[in-house]
């Protein structure tokens, strides 16, 4: 008995300095126990390795079998301290995530500030699978605002990797949109940096603040520009204040309005204010979807005025495709007001002027007024009724009001002169009718000429009325 007990102390038979092949360990109680424990440990380690392999390969049935064996816990930790649920989330296996959660896995587990939700949002997989995993974790009360060591939250990872639906889901569960990481990046900044246009649009709709700067003082728009994402740069520069939760882009009419009301081209290399001011060239190209040509044209010192007067060979020389040229030409037609050669009026005013020439002049004048009326109608329709909705940087409204007053005065003068012209023509017509030597013109010609004169007078008066409305509109601003 005593001998047996002594043997249980595992004393080396050959002493501490024994150099025998087996170190002099006696084959007895201790060796038998050690062999027994070794035999038990080996299957556990093998099962753990098999379990990890099943997790990473998505073998759901094997995972369930090993969990049912009771040897491996649902919250067991592997190398680096990861749990089975974290492994499943890292490969975006929604079915495995559901199985583990149903068996009681902790959805709020974290290792070195790395949460399972962050792991799921940054997983390599389809957005559909990632969305399902995130939805499952959120349903088990995973906190969407817990940040990693770099202070990045799940929504930042989702925005960085371009998962639009995941971003929306996180916000719906209380994720903070404007949280900043250690470098001052928000989810919007990450999306702008990586060129995720759909994410940028979604975040702006969800209330992301595009004016939050990084630690080095950069706006999301500037981050996008630095990384050559020019379309996102334009979106972030031309949208309304995103804190209102709305996304509005420049329309064609707003672009035209900007061109008509600006004085000269401006450079945009300064730090942007809350409503970034852009030169005419940038605004014009953006409105036509040609913002990708901005940098090239600016490098060649091509102004908007030069662009609008380019010939076909110049367009080709400067890298414009036929499709781009067509866009610009179409826009020019919409902006074009037909020019009348008023220098010829001195000749037409002579008594030798023919009826056809004079009628042609009246038709041109009438068409000119029609173009002007259409332009004013378009601007009145597109002008925002609320000053908060003004996208572009405007000068003082007093400047616009004073110009409108001058326009109204000019239209009134024009209306008066046209009325004088009408009276003069009517007088001439009456005198000719009373002249016994005059051969009467055909009735239809006389009626048609009278109709043209009436239409011209009505058009001019209508133009004056529209400008009066425009003046009242600006006075309200």
Swiss-Prot record:
PROSITE patterns: ANK_REP_REGION, ANK_REPEAT
Primary site of residence: cytoplasm
Gene behind this protein: ASZ1
Annotated localization: Cytoplasm
Quaternary context: Interacts with DDX4, PIWIL1, RANBP9 and TDRD1.
Keyword terms, alphabetized: ANK repeat, Cytoplasm, Developmental protein, Differentiation, Meiosis, Phosphoprotein, Repeat, RNA-mediated gene silencing, Spermatogenesis
Name of protein: Ankyrin repeat, SAM and basic leucine zipper domain-containing protein 1
Modification sites for Phosphoserine: 17-18, 20
Pfam families recorded: Ank, Ank_2, SAM_2
GO annotation, biological process: cell differentiation; male meiotic nuclear division; regulatory ncRNA-mediated gene silencing; spermatogenesis; transposable element silencing
Extent of the ANK repeats: 46-76, 80-109, 112-146, 150-179, 183-212, 216-245
Record carries keyword Mitochondrion: no
Organism name: Ateles geoffroyi (Black-handed spider monkey)
The UniProt record lists the keyword Transmembrane: no
Listed PANTHER family: ANKYRIN REPEAT, SAM AND BASIC LEUCINE ZIPPER DOMAIN-CONTAINING PROTEIN 1 (PTHR24157:SF3)
GO cellular component: pi-body
InterPro entries: Ankyrin_rpt, Ankyrin_rpt-contain_sf, Asz1_SAM, SAM, SAM/pointed_sf
Described purpose of this protein according to its UniProt entry: Plays a central role during spermatogenesis by repressing transposable elements and preventing their mobilization, which is essential for the germline integrity. Acts via the piRNA metabolic process, which mediates the repression of transposable elements during meiosis by forming complexes composed of piRNAs and Piwi proteins and governs the methylation and subsequent repression of transposons. Its association with pi-bodies suggests a participation in the primary piRNAs metabolic process.
Domain spans labelled SAM: 274-336
């Amino acid at each position: 008995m005593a001998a047996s007990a002594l043997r249980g102390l595992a004393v080396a038979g050959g002493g501490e300095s024994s150099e025998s092949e087996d170190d002099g360990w006696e084959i007895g109680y201790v060796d038998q126990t050690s062999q027994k424990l070794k035999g038990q440990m080996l299957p556990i380690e093998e099962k753990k390795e098999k379990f990890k392999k099943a997790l990473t390969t998505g073998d759901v049935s094997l995972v369930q079998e090993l969990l049912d064996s009771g040897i491996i816990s649902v919250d067991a930790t592997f190398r680096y301290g990861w749990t089975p649920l974290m492994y499943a989330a890292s490969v975006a296996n929604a079915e495995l995530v559901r199985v583990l959660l149903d068996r009681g896995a902790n959805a709020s587990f974290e290792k070195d500030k790395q949460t399972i939700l962050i792991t799921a949002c940054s997983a390599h997989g389809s957005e559909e699978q990632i969305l399902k995993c995130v939805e499952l974790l959120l349903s088990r009360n995973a906190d969407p605002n817990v940040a990693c060591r770099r202070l990045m939250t799940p929504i930042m990872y989702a925005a960085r990797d371009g998962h639009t639906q995941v971003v929306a889901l996180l916000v719906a569960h209380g994720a903070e949109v404007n949280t900043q990481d250690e470098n001052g990046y928000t989810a919007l900044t990450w999306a702008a940096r990586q060129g995720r246009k759909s994410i940028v649009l979604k975040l702006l709709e969800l209330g992301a603040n595009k004016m939050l700067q990084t630690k080095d003082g950069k706006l999301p728009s500037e981050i996008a520009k630095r990384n050559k994402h020019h379309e996102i740069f334009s979106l972030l520069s031309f949208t309304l204040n995103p804190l209102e939760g709305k996304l509005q882009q420049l329309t064609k009419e707003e672009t035209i309005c900007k061109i008509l009301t600006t004085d000269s081209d401006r450079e945009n290399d300064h730090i942007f204010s809350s409503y970034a001011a852009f030169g005419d060239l940038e605004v014009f190209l953006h409105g036509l979807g040609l913002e990708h040509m901005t940098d090239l044209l600016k490098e060649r010192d091509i102004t908007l005025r030069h662009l609008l007067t380019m010939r076909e060979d110049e367009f080709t020389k400067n890298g414009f495709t036929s499709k781009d040229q067509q866009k610009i030409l179409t826009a020019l037609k919409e902006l074009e007001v037909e020019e009348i050669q008023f220098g010829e009026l001195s000749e037409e005013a002579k008594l030798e002027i023919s009826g056809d020439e004079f009628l042609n002049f009246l038709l041109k004048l009438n068409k000119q007024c029609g173009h002007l009326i259409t332009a004013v109608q378009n601007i009145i329709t597109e002008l925002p009724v609320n000053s908060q909705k003004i996208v572009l940087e405007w000068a003082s409204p007093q400047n616009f009001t004073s110009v409108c007053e001058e326009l109204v005065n000019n239209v009134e003068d024009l209306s008066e002169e046209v009325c004088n012209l009408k009276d003069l023509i009517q007088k001439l017509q009456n005198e000719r009718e009373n002249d016994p030597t005059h051969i009467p013109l055909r009735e239809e010609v006389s009626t048609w000429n009278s109709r043209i004169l009436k239409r011209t007078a009505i058009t001019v008066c209508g133009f004056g009325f529209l400008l009066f409305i425009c003046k009242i509109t600006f006075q309200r601003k």
